[in-house]
Amino acid sequence: MYLKRILITLSLITLPIVPCLSYAAESISNVGINNTGSTANLAPAAADANVSASDKHEESWWQRSKNNLSTTWNAPQSHDIYIPTITWHNRWTYDKEKTDRYNEKPWGAGYGVSRLDKDGDWHGLYIMAFKDSYNKWEPIGGYGYEKRWRPTSDQDFQLGLGFTAGFTMRDNWNYIPIPVLLPLASISYSKLSFQATYIPGTYNNGNVFFAWFRWQI
């Protein structure tokens, strides 16, 4: 019940922002949802396809951000399951006595929606909860973006680099919502992605590698 309450609290903080942005997409025609088995075949959102080069040039960064959030929320191409996999505390920045007692198995799960835009880049909204360094539940939710590269002839194999922005809540901070802006990287093949971030910090604080699997359903 405690975990359920904090997840509900986090969703109330992060998710209502997105529907408020939906007005940005009201003039856009309905976007079909393509749920094909391969990420290489995911059809880019019609909203993106209808934006001319001149319109895109005139569009502000803030407006583009709102449009991306709104389109991802209203017209996702896939629904995703998140499985936290590893947290690793950088041994160069921690005393051994601390890392010896920290938890590095972030048991948990999450859910999200995502899409590829007309350039083949990834946009996602997600919420997940996992066991933190002190083995306490930590929820996190937000928006993720990755520029995608397809270095081989197999278009299902993709590399990604971008960022995630959202909110998290921790037991040792009394579950006060804390904004986060972190780097994001991934290796993907078809429906499966291995995504990771690095939380910077100071000595004995932060400097944590956190990774998870994302599976399109």
Swiss-Prot record:
One of its GO terms (biological process) is lipid A biosynthetic process. It catalyses: a lipid A + a 1,2-diacyl-sn-glycero-3-phosphocholine = a hepta-acyl lipid A + a 2-acyl-sn-glycero-3-phosphocholine; a lipid IVA + a 1,2-diacyl-sn-glycero-3-phosphocholine = a lipid IVB + a 2-acyl-sn-glycero-3-phosphocholine; a lipid IIA + a 1,2-diacyl-sn-glycero-3-phosphocholine = a lipid IIB + a 2-acyl-sn-glycero-3-phosphocholine. The keyword Acyltransferase applies. Residues 1-24 form the signal peptide. Belongs to the lipid A palmitoyltransferase family. It holds the Pfam family PagP. This is Lipid A acyltransferase PagP. It comes from Pectobacterium atrosepticum (strain SCRI 1043 / ATCC BAA-672) (Erwinia carotovora subsp. atroseptica). The record marks 98 as: Role in lipopolysaccharide recognition. GO terms for molecular function: acyltransferase activity. Keywords: Acyltransferase, Cell outer membrane, Membrane, Signal, Transferase. It is found in: Cell outer membrane. The active site is at residues 89, 132-133. Its EC number is 2.3.1.251. The record marks 203 as: Role in the phospholipid gating. GO terms for cellular component: cell outer membrane. InterPro entries: LipidA_acyl_PagP, OMP/PagP_b-brl. It is an enzyme of class 2 (transferase). Transfers a fatty acid residue from the sn-1 position of a phospholipid to the N-linked hydroxyfatty acid chain on the proximal unit of lipid A or its precursors. Homodimer. The keyword Membrane applies.
